[in-house]
Amino acid sequence: MFNDTWRIFRDYFYLENMHGVDWPAMRERYGVMVDDCVSRDDLNFVIGELIAELNCGHSYRGGGDLERATSVGVGMLGCDYELDNGAYRITKIHEGGVWDSDARGPLSQPGVDVNEGDYLLAINGTPLDATRDPWSAFIGLSGKVVSLTVSEKPEIDDEAREVLVKPIGNESNLRYRSWIEANRAYVEKMTDGRIGYIYVPNTGINGQNDLFRQFFGQQGKEGLIIDERWNGGGQIPTRFVELLNRPNTNYWAVREGKDWAFPPDSHQGPKCMLINGMAGSGGDMFPWLFKQAGLGKLIGMRTWGGLVGLSGNPRLIDNGFVGVPTFGFYESDGTWGIEGHGTDPDIEVIDDPALMVTGGDPQLDAAIEHMLQEIETNGYHPPARPESPDRSGMGVREEDK
């Protein structure tokens, strides 16, 4: 399998020169380690060291005949805890949107009387041990109806309440939606509703869905912050930029209400984009296209720098996989770009972990400050409606009279 990996990269890699690496020598260097591998995980490690010599993004390995322990599902409530007065207190209930069933947690369901600040005291009648991780009491309870004992006080007494909930097995989507909504609300508050916020998680199907869903809810804002930090890539996001760069072709006058801009699915105000080093592949290309289109400033940190792509290659004999880059990006001026470097910001803002752990976001704050300036100096102002015409007995154009 080691030799197959070496051959697959030799035959499928997008550049015949293998990025200048002496590929036969790498086979000798790392091949001597194979005899010392005692598990498939060991072999994956050696294969990873081999292909890392190419210094190329999207060079993957994994899977195969691996040994894995049996996992047990853990029920989750979609909330945060803190240890207080010898008991676990619920400090935050994550809520992404009551309209989205995937973004509504167990504690946000109708009839569930649990609030932030309540203490979680018992699970199915068994008192919660404050010396252990609270999740240990939820092992095997995912998707099952569970009785919670909660109270405003850190003790079980006559005021404690019994509440039935159904824990979920994965709360990542709930927390994801909650984070987006918190950012959107923060931007709304800090700009008096003048600036919109859109988060794009990747450049695949989910990213396109999220972009469109959030765009149409905020296209009436004077300006937009497009956040693509941690963008996982997927496809080349030309359609994303086409939506953000769609010009108005005309307006429609109506007797009642505000005149219509056309096409209706467009936004003409200033924009900016948030980027960081955890956005890559399509997440490298998205800000690059955004900048090429002249849509606005890039704010944050340089992106990951992985703009090569995969188009398929053989798997290994035990169904393990290797991913070989089969095509790579270069610019229209005939120079290599982005791969191995990333897309640079126009305004560099370094994250401060000490602030972020408490909910702060220096990059988002910088984007808000920038956009408030942009809408004042470069805001979009639609044309005034022309004077109502007099068409009494004549055509509109001179030759029609």
Predicted regions located by residue number:
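Amphipathic, well-packed alpha-helical segments that form the structural scaffold of globular domains
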Residues: 3-10, 27, 31, 48-55, ...
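In a subset of proteins, long, contiguous C-terminal domains/tails are tracked
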Residues: 220-222, 331-401
